[in-house]
């Protein structure tokens, strides 16, 4: 019974957004409510008084952009919450996509001023593919933004998801007065810069109550009554199962920087968000209730602490109980491993954990045994499916500026690409090292980290490739011939899989047409190594 109750009390989720929508600020407020931190570090353009807890790498502090997925745990209302913060910047989208494989639900932050943006669309596409339950937080109501009904319509249309308002704002910008909680029938009045846990709530079970007019004024009270009547008529009651199936997204309004509207959402999240769920593996369906341990590595982070050459692998527990000092089976390496100092996280703050349950994320000190997608079990041979590697969009040759540092460069490239920061390719039949990334900022991060963590100085030369496609074929001879004739455009990824580097969409389509026996894949399952 204890095992089942441990599963039910856990919620593991990610916060996702377009850059600057307020994701990191919202993360800080959640940690405040959970008692994990005492002061929130507001992230403002290059004026950071206190570096945000979840932005713990030096390069993040310089840029004010979360570029590494942080893992934070806290307790709230008897529930253990595991929050995975993700890079908002589009150049680090693959890290975010991979993190979505480790969560059971998502909170999507939308800027009320800018509405749906490019990165939001891409992230929601992954959520739809995985049928991940989504809660929407419409942020920055204290600024003049889009009409609330227009914004709901835009989100539904652009993201192909049905919405269900759970709170409703009274005005916005300088006239923003608060939010009405449609579930609890209560009014929360807004005052800028109030204390984080201040609770200025008025219970209003009947909207015709005169206290509404006294609190808001006649005009705004009349508008709220009209809005709520319309919302009730259109949306009715939320069906929690429709939310958990990924069909309906509850919507909350607020201002994260002012800690407003956040508590209502957090309370609802605890109430309706799914606990850890079942998983698919290469051999069978795995029930979360199974008592034998299993889990997978979804992220590797080299060198969290510059003073120590740490390398930490992040493990998502999927079933059973993880125990410190117990031997577990590393499926890919076919060997047993144990961990004497597994950690849980509050960003940089680590604490040793003796056991962990489904939904928990555990940090494991790693000496190079792990790759993303690796599976640990109690002996059973399977791996978890649906952990993808995506085709990069920008390709550059790595040029070593100091031949004396060749070993350091090789080690750095292997470790950084093991983390999933970028993908490493080696030209077929040669030694040319090619880095593939989703965006330019990743190259800056790699260059910075190679120099500061490994002492290797590099420059990157641009290459004229459009996409990388993994090659497979049932006809080994045809594949061998293709590789021989197209060797200038063929490389191997770090796991030895063949990749075709297409110079344009036209070249790719031509090769597909001319080589019907060969399959060109835009994604690769990372477990194939």
Specify the residue positions occupied by each region the protein language model found:
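Structural and coupling elements of P-loop NTPases
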Residues: 1-529
